[in-house]
Design a protein with these regions (language model features):
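A positional/architectural concept
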Residues: 1, 18-19, 39, 320
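Conserved helicase motor core of SF1/SF2 NTP-dependent helicases
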Residues: 105-117, 123-233, 237-339
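Hydrophobic side chains in well-ordered alpha-helices
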Residues: 18, 25, 55-59, 244-247
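Short glycine-/aliphatic-rich beta-strand segments at the starts of folded cytosolic domains
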Residues: 1-17
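Conserved loop-to-helix interface motifs that mediate assembly, gating, or partner/ligand docking
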Residues: 87-108, 112-115
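Short amphipathic alpha-helix segments
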Residues: 14-31
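Interdomain "pre-motor" coupling segment immediately N-terminal to P-loop NTPase/helicase cores
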Residues: 38-97
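A short, structured beta-strand/loop element
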Residues: 31-38
Length: 339
């Protein structure tokens, strides 16, 4: 088989970032695509079969473009560039990076990092109600918070309302010590963390005192109509069908709602229906409601977290298949007995 060669230039100021510590990114690309990469000065030569060398060149070009845009190239960037290459979507990586939602208090840009996240953010921009489902680390809550804060700063809404069911792991608010705020704070900590990072603690506290930002358990939404607000319901998998219906019918004029959850992390009583599951079935065909499914491909935490999520996904699929096969066999036995 004849070997193909592709040459390209990576300027010296970007080489360390693109190649990684001890050339870790080069080695990853070589292993994954089965190519050999030779670096001389600012030139790199890629040797292998035609498809692999062209693919490797595309990955290096995408990483170079990200580096030029000020990104620190991490292992997850390389992994995602290689994954997009397999899906023939490599060119979308830089386009995703251009979508800056806002900046943190330290000036760091907040933006989607995967195709799934970009679709989620675009849905929030276009739709009145958006469901964002996915495992931990997919950015579903953080991106929703960034969109809420941006809408608030741009005066598209007059307030932000953050809520989640506050009954988890068998703990009821009435049995916990302290006032309401101290009772619900532990449950709402992930929302506070995002607010502090993007808005800053001082600005957050001022807006809380003015009533422009409200953080409360879901039960406190009952009987209200929420106009001109950006409302986020987090941990929606732990709602009951009645709670979910109550929440959705609170949405008023000029408001936007984002519902986030992970169907695999329910803390409901055994056998209890999840309001999130029911809502997705009931509302799937309604216009102006967006439903976004984020997966292990959208995990943007440490690469090990992505592998853990994928391993659990694979395990749960195998268990589900085993259960289905058992049910089929049991059904056949019952049919035989009836005959």
């Amino acid at each position: 088989m004849s070997l193909n060669e592709v040459s390209l230039r990576i300027p010296t100021e970007h080489m360390a970032n693109v190649f990684g510590q001890f050339d870790a990114n080069i080695k990853k690309i070589e292993r994954t695509l089965g190519v050999t990469v030779i670096v001389r000065d600012d030139q790199i030569k890629i040797i292998g079969n035609e498809s692999a060398t062209n693919g490797a060149a595309e990955v290096f070009n995408q990483l170079h473009e990200l580096s030029k845009r000020g990104n620190v190239i991490a292992e997850q960037n390389v992994n995602y560039a290689l994954a997009l290459l397999q899906e023939h979507k490599g060119s979308q990586m830089v386009e995703i990076d251009k979508d800056i939602i806002c900046h943190t208090i330290n000036g760091k840009p907040v933006k989607p990092k995967t195709i799934g996240q970009k679709d989620y953010v675009d849905n929030i921009r276009k739709k009145m109600v958006v469901f964002g489902m996915g495992p931990a680390g997919t950015g579903k809550t953080y991106l929703a918070m960034a969109m809420a804060i941006t809408a608030f700063k741009n005066e598209e809404v007059s307030r932000i309302i953050l809520t989640r069911p506050a009954i988890e792991a068998g703990e009821k608010l009435g049995f916990l010590p302290g006032d309401l705020q101290s009772k619900v704070d532990p449950y709402l900590r992930p929302l506070y963390d995002a607010l502090y990072q993007i808005m800053g603690a001082e600005s957050f506290q001022k807006n809380m005192e003015k009533g422009l930002i409200e953080v409360a358990p879901l039960a406190y939404m009952r009987g209200r109509t929420l106009d001109n607000a950006f409302i986020i319901l987090d941990e929606a998998q732990n709602t009951t069908p009645a709670q979910m219906k109550m929440f959705l019918t609170r949405i008023g004029f000029g408001s936007k709602a984002v519902i986030t959850g992970d169907a695999t992390q329910k803390d409901l009583a055994p056998g209890a229906k999840s309001g999130l599951d029911v809502a997705l079935r009931v509302l799937k065909n309604i216009e102006d409601i967006g439903i976004c499914e984020l997966t292990s491909k959208d995990v943007v935490r440490h690469p090990l977290v992505q592998r853990i999520v994928q391993a659990y996904d694979d395990y749960e699929k195998k268990q589900s298949n085993k259960t289905n096969r058992k049910n089929v066999r049991a059904g056949r036995k019952n049919d035989g007995r009836q005959k």
